[in-house]
Amino acid sequence: MAPQTCAICQKAKAMVKRPKTGEQICRECFFYVFETEVHNTITQANLFKPGDRVAIGASGGKDSTVLAYVMKMLNERYQYGLELFLLSIDEGITGYRDDSLETVKRNQQQYDMPLKILSYDELYGWTMDAIVSQVGRKNNCTFCGVFRRQALDRGAAMLNVDHIVTGHNADDIAETVLMNIMRGDIARLGRCTSICTQGEDTIRRSKPFKYAYEKEIVMYAYFKKLDYFSTECIYSPDAYRGHARVFLKDLEAARPSAIIDIIHSGEAFEVREEVKATQRVQQVCQRCGYMSSNALCKACTLLEGLERGMANSGITDRARKKLDAEGPAPDNLRTIPFFKPPSGGPLIAIESVS
């Protein structure tokens, strides 16, 4: 049987079957369509304006490594006029993050981008290893997710950037939609498919890989021979997200378009006005100045519980009431430095290409 030719150029031998479309295409055409789709995602959503300082959330994994490579290449190819930086968060996970940061440092040299590394220990006075020793593995992802999100904003503020881009892909977003449905989290369900988010006191954050399948990102990294770290977090097997991931993979096996279908369904969800009226208004944390829907932001609440020897007190409202019953926080309580976001300007669209 003769080898199949590329469905796009009709010349070269097909080497890739795209999970998203089922097309069999050659390697060079795969590079072109992958890069062009990311470019069109960026331009159609008006993510950047010329002169923006953009921090790429870099973990050393496949998604962030491919994102850094593609952002640099598209910035040069289409003259976005962006100033790019790598921003890494060191959670303090021995045998995982310390090794992946070595990959990030190599990426810094390979892509010629400035690198900023901010650690949990530096910011919060705790590493994830120390936190897990206190809370166990059941709720550790809650601490890490809250601390990491705020650390990214704080690291970006230190770099004085206008924008953070992360390597969240289509699989990640579809999983998040499923998780929010299973948890009945209306507030997050209403915004989890947004390609770009920004509060009054947070830095603009977006996902250029919103419509890129994880399998295609892996194939891109493989064919481009990119340098990335492939070990999973040692604490992630116990994460709630794992259940949504298994379910999504089963759906994808039966229907490859399930990932994009779920994202489009999530985009179509609208929170009713009467439900919006019951949601908490965003304000500023009284202790650290970060955005919060309560008097104290989640990071400060979790940190206070750790510092007072009641680590799980910040997980639920009931546990928080138990901590409050112990009395006010001591004056010498370790706190997070006050947050001062950089200022940004209005967006001017970068033109799309077909």
From Swiss-Prot:
Which pathway does it take part in?
tRNA modification; 5-methoxycarbonylmethyl-2-thiouridine-tRNA biosynthesis
tRNA-binding in keyword set: yes
Location relative to the cell: Cytoplasm
> Which top EC class is given?
transferase
Determine if Transferase is one of this entry's keywords.
yes
Q: What is its main location?
A: cytoplasm
Q: Which InterPro entries match?
A: CTU1-like_ATP-bd, CTU1_C, Ncs6/Tuc1/Ctu1, Rossmann-like_a/b/a_fold, TilS/TtcA_N, tRNA_thiolation_TtcA_Ctu1
**What is the name of the protein in this document?**
Cytoplasmic tRNA 2-thiolation protein 1
Q: What phylogenetic lineage does the species belong to? A: Eukaryota, Fungi, Dikarya, Basidiomycota, Agaricomycotina
Gene this protein is translated from: NCS6
